């Protein structure tokens, strides 16, 4: 008796055990923004992505720790008092600053990632956050972020700073800055508690410029004479700091400044994340 050929299904079974089901990739950001349910493998319940927001804040200079929220826990407590429900349990990444703002620095566009437990309209999130922020802190902008994207803290690659300087004329500072940029290396040390960290400052400097500042008539003797702008890299092994650049301006290979270079103020203009335009 003639046997019929095997069916396609039987051919697959005869090759061996069936392959594990393929988990579909996360949906694009638009799906999260509109609140559509994330696809799930067969046998698993569909999951609604947690709403994730990226806040941009203007922070004043703080000279005493604790004057304003700093760590993730302090920000989480402040936001919860606004009536916003944060996702998950305390201490599990519900709120994450991109990078800590050093004491004495002004932050013009500091980044804070927030994961909420419920999806809310953008206007409502904005108004609740603004109502919860202490008076010196300003919400500059916010937008939703695809939940699968890297956290801001893991994506910081550089930062832009603006430094007001006094005590030395801008042309003299500019010559010193040019010597730093021409150097192949700038060995430096940082001292913290009982530890000393040796690093090379030169590869951390992306760009550096000096502009003259014309003080108004009748300005104080310590009025700014120059404005330093610098972009510094953030690396896993070392982070560029503007105060390191200022101290290097007065040391070899830079020429003598002929006076005491004083810092009047430092502003972190913005943090650059992976993929940001220059």
Model-derived regions, located:
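Ordered, amphipathic secondary-structure segments that act as subunit-interaction surfaces
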Residues: 108-162
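Helix N-cap motif at beta-to-alpha junctions
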Residues: 117-122, 168-170, 235
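Short amphipathic alpha-helices in soluble, non-transmembrane regions
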Residues: 122-133, 173-183, 244-246
């Amino acid at each position: 008796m003639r046997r019929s050929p095997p069916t396609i299904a039987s051919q697959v079974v005869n090759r061996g055990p069936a392959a594990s089901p393929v988990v579909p990739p996360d949906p694009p950001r638009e799906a999260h923004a509109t609140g559509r349910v994330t696809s799930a493998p067969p046998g698993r319940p569909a999951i609604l992505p947690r709403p994730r927001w990226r806040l941009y804040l203007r922070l004043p200079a703080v000279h005493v720790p604790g004057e304003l929220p700093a760590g993730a826990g302090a920000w989480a407590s402040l936001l919860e008092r606004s009536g916003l429900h944060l996702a998950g349990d305390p201490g599990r990444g519900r709120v994450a600053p991109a990078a800590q703002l050093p004491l004495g620095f002004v932050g013009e566009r500091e980044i804070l990632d927030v994961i909420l437990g419920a999806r809310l309209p953008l206007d409502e999130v904005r108004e609740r956050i603004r109502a919860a922020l202490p008076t010196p802190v300003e919400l500059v902008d916010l937008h939703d972020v695809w939940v699968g994207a890297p956290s801001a803290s893991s994506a910081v690659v550089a930062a832009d700073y603006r430094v007001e300087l006094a005590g030395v004329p801008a042309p003299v500072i500019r010559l010193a800055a040019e010597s730093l940029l021409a150097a192949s290396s700038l060995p430096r040390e940082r001292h913290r508690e009982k530890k000393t960290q040796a690093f090379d400052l030169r590869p951390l400097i992306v760009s550096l410029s000096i502009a003259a500042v014309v003080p108004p008539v009748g300005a104080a003797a310590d009025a700014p004479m120059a404005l330093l702008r610098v972009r510094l890299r953030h690396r896993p092994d070392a982070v560029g700091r503007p105060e390191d650049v200022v101290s290097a301006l007065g040391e070899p290979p830079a020429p003598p400044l002929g006076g005491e270079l004083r810092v009047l103020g430092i502003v972190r203009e913005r943090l650059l994340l992976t993929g940001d335009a220059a």
